[in-house]
């Protein structure tokens, strides 16, 4: 491949070596400290501090410092807004804490009217209950003893009627029977009497003969007449008739019991009307809490400490970033210096390739000027056996690591690193936000605590007044209820005693007493015992107890709003607010703005990085498209065989000690004679090297691939360094260093 350019286009007006030298331009060996037209190692090392990564790190530091300054400005503004919002919250909290003062009057009126209504309803209910119980007890007692009276009447009169009938039948039977017996005895005794009298008359006759007394005659007629006239007395059933007529009516007992029972009930109703008829709750006994003025913004350690903490974080981050990035910028100079030393040595070694005719001159320039990119390409290309593909791989790496591409890549990396530094700063600030949220929660807790204290004090006084009402009603009204139940129990006992006395007086000593006593116990005694147990229960449980007011009457709603899952329900939040309160919303707005800025910068840096990847993709697409094509032979339209070419063909020998003559041609023989003095020049090779790769013709119709990719990968000794000693100074060199 021929590269032909005029000497002026390559070295425009170069000053000759030694033009300033008193030696007259004579070529002399140069020492390491001599002046050269190119930068030596010392000169390169003197510019290490201006290397790409140091400058980028310093730019990142500048961006971070700008971000910190912007953060401080935004936080100062947020502090003012937060204090303003805190004042609003303080006013709201004071209003909330003073709500018991305004609502207590209404609640007191509601409580008093509720008690009055309850007492009025209680009065009506008690009057109805007392009247109902009174009538029920009277009705029950009347029903019991009237039932018992019916049973007694039925039993006694039935028994008396049966007894009287039996006695009448027995009397009639006995009267008729005795008369018949008397008549029969009269007839029998008359015959006996007549015979006996005859016998006696005979004896009297004999006795008179002998001078004795006469035997009296037997006369039974008077006795027989008495027997015939004998009958049961008519008064035999008078006792039963008297018993039948003496069955008790219990009218006296009924009247007595009814009067005793109604007396306590009438007294209770009278007391109920007197004590509860015009009941009025004393409103003055219910307290009215005083107004509250809360203060938690002035000198608030929470808000001030948060923003001071954020300022401290920003200041600390500023110092850390300055220290770390400056140290990193300084430390990166050391590997860059070492890299520059290695680059210098590699350039010196590879500069020998310029003297070798087997190399593509542009490839040699690329290898010498960009040793690391070239080395990376050579290493990557070593994985392929095909020389064409080796060239394409080297070309892709050279395309992706060109100065423009590396500038884009380094700019993208620096931008992303700056975003990372800003993100770390933002995370440090966001970690401090919960402290502010906790402090705002403490504000709400202070309001709720104030409401709790006020509500508890008010409830204590109000409950005391309600307790006094309970005591008064229990003593005045239900005390008489207790007395009434005791009196009714005593009345029932008196009723039982009176009834038992009547039964004892009426049927005592008779066969009916025990059966009637058992019937009384069964019908009335057991029922009265049950009534007495019920009255005893009423006596033990008759009292009123109005419910007390809760201690959290005024604070329950505020406390529930804080514990609610929906933070927008908090009394410190506006309706529809997305944050828990106004104060933290200010900080969230600042952090959101910073986060949005970081995201924007990250997108920009990502777009720049994408440009580099697109550039790499273009190179890969180009290389892959050439991977599939093959070199053609001459018979297939390919180039002809390579000729033995002079490596200097297409180049002009440019004298380094004199200004070249623009009128001479590149191949003029007089050019070498016009030189004032001989200068060191590269010796042409003693023999030509045959091409080891695919043939390439040096013609005007050179292919596009040859012009763009070169021949470095197509020659056997393309990457070999000549073992021939390069031009060296006669003076010792210290580390091959050049200034």
Curated annotation (Swiss-Prot):
Biased composition (Polar residues): 662-677
Positions on the Cytoplasmic side per record topology: 74-135, 342-394, 622-739
Gene Ontology terms: cellular component: mating projection tip; plasma membrane
Residue ranges, annotated region (Disordered): 634-697
The gene coding this protein: prm1
Family membership noted in the UniProt record: Belongs to the PRM1 family.
Membrane side Extracellular: residue ranges: 1-52, 157-320, 418-600
Keywords noted in UniProt: Cell membrane, Conjugation, Glycoprotein, Membrane, Transmembrane, Transmembrane helix
Function: Involved in cell fusion during mating by stabilizing the plasma membrane fusion event.
Keyword Membrane recorded: yes
Name this polypeptide is given: Plasma membrane fusion protein prm1
Transmembrane segments: 53-73, 136-156, 321-341, 395-417, 601-621
Places the protein is found: Cell membrane
Carbohydrate-modified residues: 175, 244, 273, 309, 453, 482, 489, 504, 551, 566
